[in-house]
């Protein structure tokens, strides 16, 4: 709300020199309205705004990662949030396009060793310039770590996170404990490549009622 009020109070004028990147603020007005209109999740929204300000006001460096984790159970709006984040980052020019692709284990892992790396790289290449969203990313691996296909996929993904850090935003979602044990534990380099971690809030009864009314 504060950012939207700032945009309303200060129309963009080319003959005025602002202390902040006001053009970036105006460019993200539409997706910010979408984010604001989502029911509940106040803490999550505030965290996303911190990330947006960091990148939109050029506070980041070339070696900073955009990759993000959204913790939470199914049905808490993680996919919609990821789409809005893609719109925001493409609007400010950090991402080159508004491409958004949601994938699961079946989209990344093949039936034979060696093919999984190729399949994963193809998905990464297809998403360059936009957002790759891996829902339930913990399903890529398992707690026992006996799946060699999972290791091949996750290692290839980890490589792509660095090689294309300025061209790609990877967002993964799922339960925190499962992601830690079935995804991050496969490769020690993964944790540092996902500096942004958000948690979805549990909906309150009144919020669930509003969601129901909105759908009706």
Regions found by a protein language model. Give the residues of each.
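Structural recognition of the conserved hydrophobic beta-strand(s) that form the central parallel beta-sheet
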Residues: 133-135, 155-156, 168-176
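Substrate-engagement module of ASCE P-loop NTPases
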Residues: 124-126, 153-168
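Flexible beta-alpha connector loops of hexameric P-loop NTPases
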Residues: 105-116, 139-151, 198-199
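A short helix-turn-beta junction within AAA+ P-loop NTPase domains corresponding to the substrate/partner-engaging
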Residues: 183-202
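Conserved AAA+ ATPase "sensor/coupling" helix adjacent to the nucleotide-binding pocket
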Residues: 186-188, 209-216
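Walker A/P-loop
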Residues: 63-98, 122-126
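Short glycine-rich substrate-engagement loop in P-loop NTPases that contacts/grips substrate
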Residues: 97-127
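Pre-Walker A (pre-P-loop) alpha-helix and adjacent loop at the N terminus of AAA/AAA+ ATPase modules
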Residues: 25-71, 87
